[in-house]
């Protein structure tokens, strides 16, 4: 599984780079982003919600989500006043939020086993409720005017999550849903890497990124300071491993994609996309160590 995940990232990154080199694909990139939202993120939301075993399993995902919201709040305080302040603050804070869907979930599958995988998936899905609100803000203040008919596509992960929760309340999830979640990890890695690299290198995002380093570092320091202590009080090793993977996560993949989709271009997002990878080896090393102790 670990080899498949690494291969997925490499293949996806190469595909995203190749796509960025072709003007024809770059023109269609916004449509590809929406296809990914509808066909990948929505399916994962549906499966994870259907397999939710107990409300108690949401405690740790809820704590991580609260920290994510705090990061967006902090980003709002350091974002200059403008007509796009709320939208830019969402993108900046989101850039410092852990990347559960395309990093923590695949790595948890490889390192922390089934328990860690379920916790990681729940973190990703609980955040969807708030990501839906973030998307609403981004659409409302988008420099590129959005059509109402695209709203349901942009919110499809949240809609799918709600459908999965309804099924969870009235039916038992079939066994194949567990297998599908586990083997989705390499696919998530490949698709996530492709869409991320292609979005970062999209012509609209090739802006000076060094001015955004200072704000990004403040937000990352806040993320690490809030998440690492939780790992020490986690009830078991898989949850602790997932928490350190969140603390030292790679950058979130959605801010560059949504920047392309809605017409934003922010130096903090650009800085996070380029520098946010440096902490990832620390998280992987700590997670492996926790599982072996």
Where are these regions (language model features)?
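Alpha-helical transmembrane segments of multi-pass small-molecule/ion transporters
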Residues: 1-293
